[in-house]
C-alpha cells in the first residue's frame, strides 16, 4: 500500500469492483478532474478522494476483502483521503446497519438496506438543494437504503419526509441515490471541492451536459 501523508494528492479515485464506475469517471472528466480506477493497493497513490459506487453492499464488502483493499482504504482515510459512498457505498461507510454488522464504519449513522423497497420500486424525482444548486437536483433511487439516524458531527444535506438521503461530515459524503446516473454534476462538484481540488467553471459545462444527455439511458426512465 502506498499512501504517504506528504505526497501530492490531486486525483479522485473510483473503486473499480462493482457499480457505476464508468459513469462516475465520466462525470469527473466533465469537471476537468484527474481521475482513475482504484482496484489494487498501488492505485491509492495520489488519490485525494475515493468514490465507493453503488451495487450490492454485501458483495462489494466481500470483493474489498478479496482484493485486500479494506486496510488500504482505512489507512488512506486516516492519512487524509476523503470518501464518498453512493447507495451501497453509503451502506459500507455507516457505523450502524439495521439487522447487520457494519463494514468500514467511517461515518456515524444508522442505515436501512433496501429502505425504499425492491428493484421494481426504483424511481426518479427532483428535489431542491439550495446549498449546492440554484436549480432542482435530479435524484435516482435504485433499491436504495434509508438513513435513519446521524450523529452530532454529521450534517444532513437532504431529507425527504422522515428519512435522510444525503449527509456528510468533514471527511465523508454519503448519498443513498445515484448522482452518476443523471446528467447533473452537482454532487460530484461538491465532493471534488471537499477534497480541495479545483474544477471546470460551471459555465463551461453546457456542451458536455447536452452530450451526456443524448447518450444517457436515463432519459427513458420513468419520473414520478
From Swiss-Prot:
Residues that hold L-glutamine according to the record: 55-57, 113, 142-143
Short name of any one Pfam family annotated for the protein: SNO
Pathway the protein contributes to: Cofactor biosynthesis; pyridoxal 5'-phosphate biosynthesis
PROSITE patterns according to UniProt: PDXT_SNO_2
InterPro entries from the UniProt entry: Class_I_gatase-like (IPR029062), PdxT/SNO (IPR002161)
Residue spans crossing the bilayer: none
Keywords for the protein's UniProt record, in alphabetical order: Glutamine amidotransferase, Hydrolase, Lyase, Pyridoxal phosphate
Reaction it catalyzes: aldehydo-D-ribose 5-phosphate + D-glyceraldehyde 3-phosphate + L-glutamine = pyridoxal 5'-phosphate + L-glutamate + phosphate + 3 H2O + H(+); L-glutamine + H2O = L-glutamate + NH4(+)
Record keyword Plastid present: no
Keyword Hydrolase: yes
Active-site residues, Swiss-Prot/TrEMBL: 87 (nucleophile), 178 (charge relay system), 180 (charge relay system)
GO BP annotations, alphabetical order: glutamine catabolic process; pyridoxal phosphate biosynthetic process; pyridoxine metabolic process
EC number(s) recorded for this UniProt protein: 4.3.3.6, 3.5.1.2
Entries under SUPFAM superfamilies matching the protein: Class I glutamine amidotransferase-like
Family stated for the protein in its record: Belongs to the glutaminase PdxT/SNO family.
Biological role: Catalyzes the hydrolysis of glutamine to glutamate and ammonia as part of the biosynthesis of pyridoxal 5'-phosphate. The resulting ammonia molecule is channeled to the active site of PdxS.
The protein, known as: Pyridoxal 5'-phosphate synthase subunit PdxT
Source species of the chain: Syntrophus aciditrophicus (strain SB)
UniProt lineage: Bacteria, Pseudomonadati, Thermodesulfobacteriota, Syntrophia, Syntrophales
Gene behind the chain: pdxT
